[in-house]
């Protein structure tokens, strides 16, 4: 369980579980297979390489569909999702071809409390609750991959302090 301390007296606890792995497949058109049991429920997910490098964090109303979209990149109607799907799919293919392993972690429940008391569950049916946990998990990362990825999208120069 990850505990995220907010600036106020509130604290959010997120429960992460390993649900499967990503492997290369010769019989699938794009070469990706997701192994494990990913639930068809709302939540937040992490794609990690070599068990330590968390490479991508996202959220979805249906985790099974969202994660499978990476295997079927190019079949989605929305252009922004298709771009993300192809980018993550390409990255996963490269990592797996380089001999690395990839795992999928999900968070389907999180709790909020004020000063450690009165813990309440954050309903993940609400997109904003998923976005809060996703943002906290991204902020919690210590590796540079996500940071570099986000910075590349900004067209002007800026200074980032660690």
Please state what every model-predicted region is.
Residues 1-44, 49-55, 61-162:
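Boundary/linker segments flanking structured domains
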């Amino acid at each position: 369980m990850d505990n995220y301390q907010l600036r106020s007296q509130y604290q959010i606890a997120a429960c992460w579980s390993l649900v499967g792995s990503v492997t290369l497949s010769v019989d699938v058109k794009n070469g990706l297979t997701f192994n494990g049991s990913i639930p068809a429920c709302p939540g937040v997910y992490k794609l990690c390489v070599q068990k330590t490098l968390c490479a991508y964090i996202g959220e979805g109303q249906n985790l099974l569909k969202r994660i499978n979209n990476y295997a079927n990149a190019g079949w989605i109607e929305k252009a922004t999702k298709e771009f993300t799907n192809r980018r993550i799919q390409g990255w996963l293919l490269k990592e797996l071809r380089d001999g690395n392993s990839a795992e999928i972690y999900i968070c389907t429940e999180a709790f909020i409390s004020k000063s450690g008391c009165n813990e309440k569950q954050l309903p993940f049916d609400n997109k904003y609750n998923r976005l809060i946990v996703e943002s906290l998990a991204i902020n919690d990362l210590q590796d540079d991959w996500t940071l570099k990825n986000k910075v590349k999208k900004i067209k002007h120069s800026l200074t980032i302090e660690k």
